Amino acid sequence: DAVGLTKGERIYIEAFRNSTQDFFRELIAVSSKIGATPFYYFNDESFTRSFLLNASEAAIKAHGEIHRRLMAESDAYVAVRGNDDVFALSDVPEKKMALYRKNYLQPVHSEVRVPQTRWCVMRYPNPAMAALSRMSLKEFEDFYFDACLVDYRKMEKELQPLKKLMDRTDKVRIVAPGTDISFSIKGIGSVICCGHRNIPDGEVYTAPVKNSVNGVVQFNTDTTYNGIFFSNIRLVFKDGKIIEASSLVNNDKLQKILDQDEGARYLGEFSFGMNPFITKPILDILFDEKIAGSFHMAIGNAYTTADNGNRSAIHWDLIQIQTPEKGGGEIYFDGRVVRRNGKLL
């Protein structure tokens, strides 16, 4: 249902890690029974690591060109990740990661997959994800299925008032411990995410007007990006641009990521996390950005569906949880409080 695949269409199916293989086979079987043509690609961050540590710039570029052609010929895309080793790329030099983002992630995914296909990205539960979440496997599986199998039709209806409010809002201000940031979302529009692009899902996103962002924001949720761990990221903006940035760990790598390209120092997304079954971080952005009572901002590339014009090889969602346990906070729309301590008013 997520990608609406029909007979005669082509689907690019990508699976990561051995723990996904049973589900991967089922996706291939189901798409074939429908009468679609699957291109199935088994991937693994350890494969990517081996490639990047040894590949030339020309080889990385050629790798991206091959997959861009395949993606351009596809009507739909599904990715399922096992996330057995979120740090698999941690020792790949940043220069190589920058080439990979520029020549593979941006042209294949940001420029083709996201705007041109019907796509869905999801996870598959396994012991490693449970361990990162500090849960038993059984507890994690229950959490996973609760979060993923929420009633998305009901969610879509319930999020309509927030979308309508965002669509008519100009000025946004966010105040929380370590945070006082303002920006405009006038004319950008907003999108409800309810089970079509991510599993689990549950957010309403827009984007700040590119040059309107001013102030400071502190993200109180740990995160990983391309296998690197970051904590307590703090960003200072002036006229849309990040002019200061820090992380408690791997601060030097944060600076290199922000220097990827011009767009990496501007925001491409602002979003409310709205999944009621996701209430604490598990070090997986796909889940953490949906935490009820949170918001996230993405540095880098904007989606064409809520477009502020920013383009970058980066799209990195950074999360602040505003529940009382995490310090609380307020979000103002045109001077009026619309959410306090994680609860919409």
Residue ranges of each PLM-predicted region?
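A short, compositionally biased
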Residues: 165-171, 229-231, 323-330
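Active-site bordering "gate/hinge" segments
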Residues: 1-215, 341
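Short, glycine-/Ser/Thr-/acidic-enriched flexible segments
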Residues: 18-19, 83-85, 126, 188, ...
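Oxyanion-binding "anion nests"
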Residues: 201-245
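Dual-mode signal for accessory low-complexity, basic/Gly-rich regions
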Residues: 244-309
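Short acidic-glycine loop/turn motifs at beta-strand connectors
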Residues: 177-178, 185-187, 237-239, 333-336
